Amino acid sequence: MEEPTSSTNENKMKSPCESNKRKVDKKKKNLHRASAPEQSLKETEKAKYPTLVFYCRKNKKRNSNQLENNQPTESSTDPIKEKGDLDISAGSPQDGGQN
C-alpha cells in the first residue's frame, strides 16, 4: 500500500462546524465594531477640560499691537514688495528707464 504524501497530510479538510463558527465570530466582531463609535461619542461629550485651538501662520511675524488692533504695520518686511517699490521709484525696465 502507498503511504500518504506530505501534501495530503498538510491539506486537511475542515469540518462545516468550524467554518460556521468562524462566520459567527466575524459577525460578532463586525457588530462590536459598529457599536464601538457610539460608546466613544458618549465618552467625548463628558470632557473634563475645554479644548483650545491656536492658529499660526508660517513665516508671518506679528507684534502684540497687531494682535490687539488686527491692523497690519506700515513698514513691510516683504522683499518682493520692497523690490517693486525700488523699481517704481527708479523707473521700470519696461518704460525704458526714462523719467
Swiss-Prot record:
TM ranges are none
Basic and acidic residues bias spans: 11-22
Region Disordered: what ranges? 1-99
Q: Where is the composition biased (Basic residues)?
A: 23-32
Domain of life of the organism in this record? Eukaryota
InterPro entries found in the cross-reference section: SPAN-X_fam
Compositionally biased intervals (Polar residues): 1-10, 64-78
The identity of this protein, by name, is: Sperm protein associated with the nucleus on the X chromosome N4
Q: Which Pfam families match?
A: SPAN-X
Similarity section: Belongs to the SPAN-X family.
